A protein has these predicted regions:
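Short, intrinsically disordered terminal tails adjacent to the first/last structured region
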Residues: 1-20
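A detector for short, charged/polar N-terminal pre-domain segments
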Residues: 18-33
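A structural signal for multi-pass alpha-helical bundles of membrane permease subunits
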Residues: 29-295
């Protein structure tokens, strides 16, 4: 009894250092949270002010210092935007361009990524390096050649001028390649033995396993095409072919700007982007953490 009591009494104080060590390990996380909370608030404030100002009048928005909270709920900006006869057409144009771009990048990007990941052909590495090099070329250097090509094809001032340059991007091909390199080959080899073609293997076996990559490419492509303003501003002249981003610029005149309408239109424009990210958030983050590690 005495010996066991002594052992028990001697072992009891050993738990205290472990607790102190755990607290020391948790302190940095708390410090990070305290640091990230104000930063998150700073990033969220512009979006919050955008929503609040969409319910203000033009006088409230133009006031200095600017109002942080509307005196009353005013739907004048939304009535102005939704009452514009061209607004449904602009919204439909943006949906068409974004949908076609997302679909083509998923299909063509997966085909290109699978070819670079699984097929070895002469010049594949050089072609991959050339494709990746195009990712660092700024748009300002390619917009004039792209415009001339679209003019030669007769697509200027049509939605085709917005769709064709975004049919497939090097980033989509690269992301699919990196993800496919991380998948095991055993299932593909078994399908080949059963007589499946490469296309059947890609779309029936590999593609279902690549849902994170598919979601990531879909979200990023949708964001790029939906929010694009610079290229439609160059390629589109007639208001019937305007996208939503380009149409919102018509609310800004030389001498007067309908700021309430601009804010309301931006809120409507942001909603599809937020919904797309919220629905694909889990698979989007999973793809970012799992791809890019293979070379």
């Amino acid at each position: 009894m005495t010996a066991s009591t002594m052992v028990t009494e001697g072992a009891a104080p050993a738990a205290a250092p472990a607790t102190r060590t755990t607290r020391r390990r948790r302190l940095p996380f708390s410090a990070w949270h305290l640091l990230l909370a104000p930063l998150s608030l700073c990033f969220a404030l512009p979006l919050v002010w955008l929503v609040l100002s969409s319910f203000m009048t033009n006088a409230e928005i133009n006031r200095f210092p600017p109002a942080l909270w509307p005196k009353g709920i005013d739907f004048g900006g939304y009535r102005y935007v939704l009452g514009n006869a061209m607004f449904p057409r602009w919204f439909a144009n943006s949906c068409i361009v974004s949908t076609v771009a997302v679909g083509s990048n998923l299909v063509l990007g997966a085909l290109g990524g699978y070819a670079f990941a699984r097929m070895r052909f002469r010049g594949s590495r050089a072609l991959l390096a050339l494709m990746l090099a195009t990712m660092v070329i700024p748009f300002q250097l390619t917009m004039i050649p792209t415009f001339l090509v679209m003019k030669w094809l007769g697509l200027i001032d049509t939605l085709g001028a917005l769709i064709v340059p975004s049919l497939v991007t090097p980033f989509a091909v690269f992301l699919f390649r990196q993800f496919f390199l991380g998948l095991p080959r055993e299932m593909e080899e078994a399908a080949w033995i059963d007589g499946c073609s490469r296309l059947r293997v890609l779309f029936s076996i590999v593609a279902p396993l690549a849902r994170p990559a598919l979601a990531t490419v879909a979200v990023l492509t949708f964001l790029a095409t939906w929010n694009d303003l610079s290229w439609p501003l160059i390629a589109i002249n007639h208001d019937t072919q305007y996208t939503l981003q380009l149409g919102l610029t018509t609310f800004q005149g030389q001498h007067h700007t309908q700021w309430a309408a601009v804010m309301a239109g931006n809120v409507i424009t942001v909603l599809p982007v937020l919904l797309a990210f919220l629905f694909a958030q889990r698979t989007f983050i999973q793809s970012l953490t799992s791809s890019g590690l293979k070379g």
